[in-house]
């Protein structure tokens, strides 16, 4: 038994958990936490145009295999376990059986912290779908467990929508995680995504931007890279969180 919190991440596509919260995953994993990532799809359509362009005649199953390998390598770099429910993407359609699988994983791991997408994203509706399904699944799991105790409500945080669409999605972060000490780990994980080679440079710049905000809010000059989240779960405790 460990006193370290368990994290579960619900990600619409292969790259989302790495680009949006890869630093936070690495930070918790390095500190001894179990981190389990549930990808709802491989992003075989919406995230893989390069494969479709460069490999004439490639099949959907072959694209999925490439993305699965990239996903597994990246998760290994971050120190996370990962599975994919293979719901398909663009559009992402999550069925009842998939939700039951997600509930089963929540019962198995009983995370204290859950990370998923921001709830509004008109330019990438798969992300909003993933957020809706993840939040409903947590609610279902907190109501009943046919095999034991209902899930204790975890602390839920919503990560970045697609950059640079934050203004259009009304995302307003209230939580910043300093990932300076694990930023190179995040970059190495992003570099495993040969299908999306531009992401590492892109999220380096955005990590710097969020760090600038975090420095301005805290006065801490040592924050060079950060990830931003919006709290979904109300805080309940004997004292204010610090």
Segments predicted by a language model, with ranges:
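Active-site rim/loop-helix segments in enzyme catalytic domains that contact anionic ligands
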Residues: 1-109, 238-239
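Metal-dependent de-N-acetylase/amidase catalytic core
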Residues: 1-10, 81, 88-242
């Amino acid at each position: 038994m460990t006193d370290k919190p368990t994290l579960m991440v619900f990600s619409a596509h292969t790259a989302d958990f790495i680009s949006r919260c890869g630093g936070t995953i690495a930070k918790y994993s390095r500190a001894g936490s179990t981190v389990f990532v549930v990808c709802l799809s491989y992003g075989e359509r919406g995230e893989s145009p390069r494969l479709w362009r460069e490999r004439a005649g490639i099949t959907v199953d072959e694209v999925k295999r490439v993305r699965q390998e990239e996903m597994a390598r990246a998760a290994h770099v971050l120190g996370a376990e990962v599975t994919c429910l293979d719901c398909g993407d663009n559009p992402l359609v999550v069925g009842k059986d998939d939700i039951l699988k997600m509930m089963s994983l929540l019962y198995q791991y009983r995370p204290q912290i859950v990370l998923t997408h921001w709830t509004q994203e008109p330019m990438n509706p798969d992300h909003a779908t993933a957020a809706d399904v993840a939040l409903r699944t947590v609610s279902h799991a907190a109501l009943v467990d046919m095999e034991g105790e209902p899930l204790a409500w975890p602390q839920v945080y919503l990560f970045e929508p697609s950059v640079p669409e934050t203004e259009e999605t009304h995302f307003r972060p209230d939580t910043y995680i300093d990932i300076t000490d694990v930023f190179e780990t995040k970059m190495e994980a992003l570099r495993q995504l040969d299908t999306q080679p531009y992401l590492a440079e892109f999220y380096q710049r955005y990590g710097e931007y969020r760090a600038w905000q975090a420095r301005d809010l805290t006065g801490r000059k040592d924050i060079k890279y950060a990830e931003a989240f919006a709290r979904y779960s109300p805080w309940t405790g004997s004292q204010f969180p610090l």
